[in-house]
């Protein structure tokens, strides 16, 4: 596995060229990118811009819960965008899955996701790209909603298995692993191909597990509430070879100058690196 920079996740909003420069300066091996940018500029220019950094992964470029007519159109476009990602050597894409719904009960929502994710998985598979889905662990995200949905690792793995395209796995975020009550043994039981993408961060101290709020986090290693090093060691032990990025939702970080924000993030990841 390797350290990758996601500039948007730490509030850095500068051109990709500057992001690449900051990533290389601070020891990152890869960078997350906008797949539409890669398609627009073409593979030669994209590779030149990345300057040797690995193209870590790209987020699914549309909301898969859209209207059926829009979804069909967007999946067709996804094939073209995936070809652009393939051309620069990217093999990973990911998105998050809401842990609630106001209209669909669990089983109905599960079938909806199976159908939609099958289309997405097949479109990406044509270009050698794996698709990671993030379950959301916090109970506070489900509170106040009519129906609960997937919010644990085992449930998400079931969706991957039952959808059956062969290229589906987890976007495994240690925050959601922690808030869902996950254990290191759960991580150690995974196969490397079941993990597509990895996010790390920490949680504020003194807050019960079922009261942790999704958008109140910390940099990895900042508080020690989450055993981030143990989490990464478990991933290393199963042979995970993909990117690891920080997603701290930190107001303090987002208010820093870009060069400082990237440097602080790199130092935080290094502090928990196996």
Predicted stretch roles:
Residues 1-27, 44, 51, 83-84, ...:
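Histidine-acidic metal/acid-base catalytic patches
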Residues 9-11, 35-39, 61-64, 97-101, ...:
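Active-site-proximal loop/turn and secondary-structure-junction residues that shape catalytic pockets
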Residues 32, 57-59, 94, 132, ...:
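Conserved beta-strand positions in the central sheet of alpha/beta enzyme cores
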Residues 32-51, 101, 105:
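Glycine-rich, proline-tolerant flexible connector loops at the mouths of alpha/beta enzymes
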Residues 40-41, 73, 227:
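Aromatic- and glycine-enriched glycan-recognition loops and surfaces
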Residues 48-73:
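Short hydrophobic interaction/assembly module
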Residues 55-59, 137, 211:
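Short, basic/glycine-rich phosphate-binding loops at helix/coil junctions
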Residues 67-169, 179, 256, 260, ...:
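Active-site acidic/histidine proton-transfer and metal-coordination neighborhood
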